[in-house]
Amino acid sequence: MTETLRVAVIGAGRMGADHIQRLSKRIHGAEVAAVVDVDLARAQAAVEGIPGAVALADADEALNNGDVNAVLIATPGFLHEDILLKALARDIPILCEKPLTPDAESAWKIVQAEEKLGHKRIQVGFMRRFDAEYAALGQVIRDHELGELLMLHHQHRNPTTPPGFTNEMLINDSVVHEFDAIRFFTGEEITSVQVRLGKATKNAPAGQHDPQHVLVETESGVLADVEIFVNAKFGYEVATQASFEDGIVSIGGDKGPYTRAAGRWGGNVTPGFEERFGAAYDVEIQSWVDAALRGEIGGPTAWDGYATAACCEAGVEAQKNGEKVAVKLNARPALYS
């Protein structure tokens, strides 16, 4: 591998634009070679001020560009499969924002294609694994510092949702992060998902039941629950409490300056995910670049993307029938053992 990744960023929307700035200003060992967006004007705006970067409207043109030796995919999930297969055919490093693909069937095709290649090229963008608090909790679990992990309690709260955010998206776009976190913390697959729908907020748009309570079980019997509340209004909050045999560990929440003044006390609430996980995104992309330059990946694999897609399918089914739904997984290929 060369000493520099020349990255084609495919998708210049909110997430793609953020990664373009990250790669061009804060990440070492990589540079933006091309930006692709169906809205060419948006791609052109994204490359302004980045020497040598070209704006394109077609992903194939970027993937066929010999000057490009890595790809970062930040398009909507339904476009991922085709881009992933073409990038795998080129055998170049890939960072794919979640989801790997929108469903388990297509995600399995990606796993099979990478397995056929014979080595891992895809890193999936579950950035919470790179958050300092998540990493610290993961270390406590692996070191058995407080005995065995017994239960996990997650809260995932957003101030509001964009237009078109459906009931299924509470699982596919939001709880997907907790599914990956549970797998990351336990080192186990999730075996079942149940979703309970209780009293709903008046702030939820038509067709969306909010909040929801998601119940999860892993292979060894670790129980986890997720409160997903995407119209919480007050701000953005992602928190986890882990129950061990010999103690409790809590991460997340707001721990900024605590002020007492003029007859009041308190602090500030994090407004959004960019502020909460901005540093984690930086660590994630740097890890991908460093690993790619060694011919490796530096984070979640295509198998992780497939497994979370299967969890999401079980979660959406559980939303609809109210039952405990088994997660259906194919056998894990040796490549991901």
UniProtKB/Swiss-Prot annotation:
GO terms for molecular function: inositol 2-dehydrogenase (NAD+) activity; nucleotide binding. It holds the Pfam family GFO_IDH_MocA_C. Keywords: NAD, Oxidoreductase. It comes from Arthrobacter sp. (strain FB24). This is Inositol 2-dehydrogenase. It is an enzyme of class 1 (oxidoreductase). It catalyses: myo-inositol + NAD(+) = scyllo-inosose + NADH + H(+). Involved in the oxidation of myo-inositol (MI) to 2-keto-myo-inositol (2KMI or 2-inosose). The gene is iolG. Belongs to the Gfo/Idh/MocA family. Its EC number is 1.1.1.18. GO terms for biological process: inositol catabolic process. Homotetramer. HAMAP family: IolG.
